[in-house]
UniProtKB/Swiss-Prot annotation:
Species: Mus musculus
Main location as per UniProt: cytoplasm
Membrane topology of this protein: Peripheral membrane protein
Gene3D superfamilies given in the database record: 1.10.12.70, Nucleotidyltransferases domain 2
Protein name: Programmed cell death protein 10
Modified residues annotated as N6-acetyllysine in this record: 179
Cross-link (Glycyl lysine isopeptide (Lys-Gly) (interchain with G-Cter in SUMO2)), chain numbering: 186
Superkingdom assignment: Eukaryota
């Protein structure tokens, strides 16, 4: 049975999403290890990247097994959200023009606000302010994306437009999740949706970095 284009896109999105723990959890570990043993850290990083590429979700499985073995009870989705604000070198745009650096900055700002959700969600007043801040950060990021579109011409504009549409789709999904949360109080769904939005934010940077 052949998959439709939409199903293929959804599968690709799910596959890359399960790899989120590689850069959110393991990259900071590799960075710390580099200070002690640069060669070992680089070898380990390369091995994890290769293994994750061939078996998406492997890093998450390894982390979960370690936590299970140590009998550590942790909400992995919440913890992932808390850690996902850090810059990931592989996604950062290196072009020096102000518009591109502004794109890095706006993406960073959105991720940092989203990562604070677990700390704010139980305080209704603070959480409502956080939601407003997220909405503003989303708008600012999209405005910056549009500014780059206006100023620079791309051969692969279709890929950029597609990624922008995906980001908008997940932004709306996040908004819908918030509305549901205020009815059912299930914070875990907000954390999942926020992680997806952070992932889409990283993919915007990655797409611009690839074609720019």
């Amino acid at each position: 049975m052949r998959m439709t284009m939409e199903e293929m896109k959804n599968e690709a999105e799910t596959t890359s999403m399960v790899s989120m723990p590689l850069y959110a959890v393991m990259y900071p570990v590799f960075n710390e290890l580099e200070r002690v043993n640069l060669s070992a850290a680089q070898t380990l990083r390369a091995a994890f990247i290769k293994a994750e590429k061939e078996n998406p979700g492997l890093t998450q499985d390894i982390i979960m097994k370690i936590l299970e073995k140590k009998s550590v009870e942790v909400n992995f989705t919440e913890s992932l959200l808390r850690m996902a604000a850090d810059d990931v070198e592989e996604y950062m745009i290196e072009r020096p023009e102000p518009e591109f650096q502004d794109l890095n900055e706006k993406a960073r700002a959105l991720k940092q606000i989203l990562s604070k959700i677990p700390d704010e969600i139980n305080d209704r007043v603070r959480f409502l302010q956080t939601i407003k801040d997220i909405a503003s950060a989303i708008k600012e990021l999209l405005d910056t994306v549009n500014n780059v579109f206006k100023k620079y011409q791309y051969q692969n504009r279709r890929a950029l437009e597609h990624q922008k549409k995906e980001f908008v789709k997940y932004s709306k999904s996040f908004s819908d999740t918030l509305k549901t949360y205020f009815k059912d109080g299930k914070a875990i769904n907000v954390f999942i949706s926020a992680n997806r939005l952070i992932h889409q934010t990283n993919l915007i940077l990655q797409t611009f970095k690839t074609v720019a």
